[in-house]
């Protein structure tokens, strides 16, 4: 039975690591995040804005969980997630900016 304990232990360590990452994320301000998403709105079709590139598929980002937005923007910032435009956007944001953007986008309906 000791072989069954290793996967459980490994799973617990991964879970703890993800909680540690979230614990280090600053609290986000949805009000400030709204201002920061100005450049996002044309491409991602945030309600009230016309999509600037109707023939180019981009993901809908409104209503996403804060964790999803934080992880995606952080990965673009680090260069581990690839897309030239989004990497440039991600690199322009601080951790606080990313938390604020996540707070705003997660407050909107999908």
Q: What do the PLM-derived regions correspond to, one by one?
A:
Residues 63:
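Conserved strand-loop elements at the edges of beta-sheets that form or border functional pockets
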Residues 24, 109-110:
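Short, solvent-exposed mixed-charge patches
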Residues 33, 38-46, 101:
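The canonical Cys-X-X-Cys-His
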Residues 19-37, 49:
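Electrostatic cytochrome c docking/interface patches
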Residues 51-60, 75-109:
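Axial heme c-ligation environment in periplasmic c-type cytochrome domains
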Residues 9-18:
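Bacterial N-terminal signal peptides
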Residues 1-4:
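N-terminal secretory signal peptides that target proteins for export/translocation
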């Amino acid at each position: 039975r000791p072989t069954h304990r290793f996967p459980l232990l490994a799973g617990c360590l991964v879970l703890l690591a993800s909680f540690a990452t979230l614990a280090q994320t600053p609290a986000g301000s949805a009000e400030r995040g709204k201002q920061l998403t100005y450049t996002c709105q044309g491409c991602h079709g945030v309600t009230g804005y016309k999509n600037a590139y109707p023939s180019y598929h981009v993901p809908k980002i409104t209503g996403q969980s804060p964790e999803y937005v934080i992880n995606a923007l952080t990965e673009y910032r680090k260069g581990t997630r690839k897309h030239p435009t989004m990497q440039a956007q991600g690199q322009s944001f601080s951790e606080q900016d990313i938390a604020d953007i996540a707070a705003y986008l997660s407050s909107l309906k999908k």
